Amino acid sequence: QLNSTERLQRSYITGIDQIVVDIEAKVDQAFLDEFQLRRGMSQVIDSDITNALYDRLKLDNMIDYEFAGGTVGNTMHNYSTLADDRSVLLGVMSENIKIGSYAYRFLCNTSSRVDLDYLQPVDGPIGRCFTLIDETGERTFAISAGLMNHLRPESIDQELIENSSALVISAYLMRTQGDETMTEATMQAVKYANDAGVPVVLTLGTKFLIEQDPTWWADFVKEHVDILAMNEEEGLAITGFEDPLLAADKALDWTDLVICTAGEKGLFMAGYVDDSFKRETEYPLLPGAIADFNRYEFSRAMRKDDCQNPIRAYSHTAPFMGGPDSIKNTNGAGDCALAAVLHDLSANVYHKLNVANSAKHQQPAMTYSSLAQISKYANRASYEVLVQHSPRLSRGLPEREDCLEQVYWDQ
């Protein structure tokens, strides 16, 4: 029972990111050649090329969109939009911000529910990521780091991490070099989270990074990560399995909960549940690489260590409404799916904080809802990003869906 005399305790999510602004433009091959950019690849460019590239795009009026980016930044924004609640973003921010600058653009495009008070000030620019799209739709990425990788370990607030519902990091944070301190800062936060039993959520971000050393990433996940988010390409890179269900299953060897977005195939989730808490689905059993894999999808996911007799549970949701008629943007769909999963995880922590004696918490579950419910929610949230241009939601989901009412289809 809820104690109404006391003030409700709040739960929140913390994320670490390279603070970056996404700049999108349409270009041709000659433009890529001029700036020595390899088509279809992601490459880091120095500040001179960055400034020349940006000036050229501005001069020729080629920029289509300029908005706040970053995998974890997008996830925090979307979490706060869906949950209408606080998240905390850690990273760097330019100390002096001019109106109209990239840093200004980042602040403007981030939900007011995202707490930016813990950002570390730096004397210089934040990151810029150019997405250059040619006439065939192929995307070429050019990244200018600025000072985005200069988050210091001492800027990580231990108490903030220890009281979080989850800590969200991305694989990009491990790609620092020279005098950049982002990797050390991230590992400091991960250590605080691991020691305090706070779930660490890793989003893989790009297959190219994982392909360089899949064994290292598998070991990292095994040692530090509780929830893994990936798409089918990243799943193939880290597990060696092309089938998203088998990739998610393999990842369960190392972690407790897996989210795998698989484009037009929809979304797969895999997790553990104790045999005594398993719940059979009421939906038809699905065929696949694992026969009847969704049998226990009505179960709530648990950490493997909390299970006396762990069994694996899987769920799959096909694209909402069959997928959008036209996909405006695939960038950020996975981030939005993860934000929905985090919303459910945080709701569970919130309920536990305020209604600790609820029968709901006799099962030490990680999530409030079943795998099937979360999979549907994550799938629905990612659809919202696919039909708009920005990877960031501008509003939460509707309370009721017209398309779920029979009358909608009778029209």
Indicate residue ranges for each PLM-predicted region:
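Active-site gating loops and adjacent loop-to-helix segments of metal-dependent hydrolytic enzymes
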Residues: 35-59
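Active-site alpha-helical elements of protease catalytic centers
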Residues: 66-88, 335-339
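Glycine-/proline-rich flexible loop or hinge segments
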Residues: 52-63, 82-90
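Short, threonine-centered small-residue motifs that mark membrane-proximal processing/anchoring sites
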Residues: 328-331
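Ribokinase/PfkB-type carbohydrate-kinase core domain
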Residues: 1-42, 63-67, 71, 86, ...
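The catalytic Tyr-X3-Lys active-site helix of short-chain dehydrogenase/reductase
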Residues: 333, 337, 374, 378
